[in-house]
């Protein structure tokens, strides 16, 4: 099992890169967001997911951060979603956008090639409890307060995605009064 690969990008293809590591060139499938930042000759470290297809051919999927990698792991748990489909979803959505689409049951956001209405409904059914639990765990680390709940509502009303707001509130740390909490969270969200 491969956990990470660090090397030099030899070639950038349509949906993958060839990563030279110790004299071996690995074909690594990456999301569009990763692909647009890849340039031949650049050094890169990727977190790797390995999948062996029906023909017993191993395929490597690489991610620049563990958040996107964990989203892929979560998506492939849904019956009917394979690695390629999960990567197509991650091509279109950031992890925050994915969580938001699941929690808000935003069918249009999840509409990508190979993902029909039945599969989208299955994603909502199977992943909504998991995503809500993840959001609860973020708030639970600090112990939510009335100010946190009010700050969450205020920031959501400004149009920020719930997952981003929860992450910002987590980074703000110790609860402040409401106006300070919102101000510090807005600074965090603007980064």
UniProtKB/Swiss-Prot annotation:
Domain II: region residues: 65-145
Subcellular location: Cytoplasm
Stretches for region Domain I: 1-64
Domains: entry comment: Has three domains with a flexible linker between the domains II and III and assumes an 'L' shape. Domain III is highly mobile and contacts RuvB.
Family per similarity comment: Belongs to the RuvA family.
Function: The RuvA-RuvB-RuvC complex processes Holliday junction (HJ) DNA during genetic recombination and DNA repair, while the RuvA-RuvB complex plays an important role in the rescue of blocked DNA replication forks via replication fork reversal (RFR). RuvA specifically binds to HJ cruciform DNA, conferring on it an open structure. The RuvB hexamer acts as an ATP-dependent pump, pulling dsDNA into and through the RuvAB complex. HJ branch migration allows RuvC to scan DNA until it finds its consensus sequence, where it cleaves and resolves the cruciform DNA.
Protein name (Swiss-Prot/TrEMBL): Holliday junction branch migration complex subunit RuvA
Gene this chain is encoded by: ruvA
